[in-house]
């Protein structure tokens, strides 16, 4: 799709700095020659601000569609799992345009594969939990827990896991570097700085 279309929407203020772009351009070098359109998607829990950004993103894409362009929207992982793209997708559909989702590989599946680890086997359960919210109840569930989107709360999440003597993650922390350079760590204490993506 990237090769077949000339207009590529990229989440963020600066498309070339987007992790999604940096990964995609390695796989499809022709991407560097395409028209890149920035779709700002600030990470916030402010509902009004989110709504406004989703509206603006959809309008920008609709303007491109009205100009007769086919648009590919890059995103990390799979667009159906905690993806800001979904909000834009729904708006574009509601406004009468054609939009399709192409599945990708979730960050937690990519991380597990890079560690040569399985997430679940046989009758085990898998729970995907947004870690920037309350996680205590979810950690009581049986099976494997995938903690995503911890963001600024990662130090608090790590502390909580240590206090609860939690072994659900087997102390495996993955940040965005797993995606670009396949670096990983098995220490919950390893990172003192802000991290973006982990399971």
List each language-model region with its residue ranges:
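Class I S-adenosyl-L-methionine
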Residues: 3-97, 180
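A contiguous loop/helix-start segment that scaffolds small-molecule binding in enzyme catalytic cores
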Residues: 11-12, 139-187, 192-199
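Short, acidic/turn-prone active-site loops that include or flank metal/cofactor-
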Residues: 12-15, 41, 105-106, 124-133, ...
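Conserved beta-strand scaffold positions in the cores of enzyme catalytic domains, especially
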Residues: 36-38, 99-101, 128, 168-170
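A polyampholytic, Gly/Pro-enriched intrinsically disordered region
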Residues: 54-63, 118-130, 192-199
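Residue-level preference for the first positions of well-ordered beta-strands
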Residues: 68-72, 125, 144-146
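Class I SAM-dependent methyltransferase SAM-binding "motif I" and its flanking Rossmann-like core
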Residues: 80-141
């Amino acid at each position: 799709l990237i090769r077949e279309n000339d207009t590529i929407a990229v989440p963020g203020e600066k498309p070339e700095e987007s992790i999604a772009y940096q990964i995609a351009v390695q796989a499809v070098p022709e991407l560097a020659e395409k028209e890149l359109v920035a779709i700002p998607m600030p990470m916030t829990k402010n509902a009004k601000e989110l709504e406004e950004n989703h509206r603006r993103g959809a309008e920008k894409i609709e303007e491109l569609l009205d100009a007769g362009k086919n648009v590919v929207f890059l995103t990390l992982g799979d667009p159906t799992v905690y993806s800001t793209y979904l909000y834009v997708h729904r708006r574009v559909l509601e406004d009468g345009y054609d939009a399709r989702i192409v599945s990708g590989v979730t960050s937690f599946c990519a991380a597990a594969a890079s560690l040569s680890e399985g997430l679940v086997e046989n009758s085990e359960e898998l729970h995907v939990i947004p870690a920037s919210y309350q996680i205590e109840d979810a950690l009581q569930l049986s099976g494997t827990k995938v903690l995503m989107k911890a963001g600024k709360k990662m130090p608090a999440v790590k502390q909580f896991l240590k206090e609860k003597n939690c072994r659900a993650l087997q102390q495996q922390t993955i940040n965005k570097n797993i995606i670009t350079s396949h670096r990983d760590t098995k220490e919950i204490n390893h990172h003192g700085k802000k991290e973006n993506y982990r399971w």
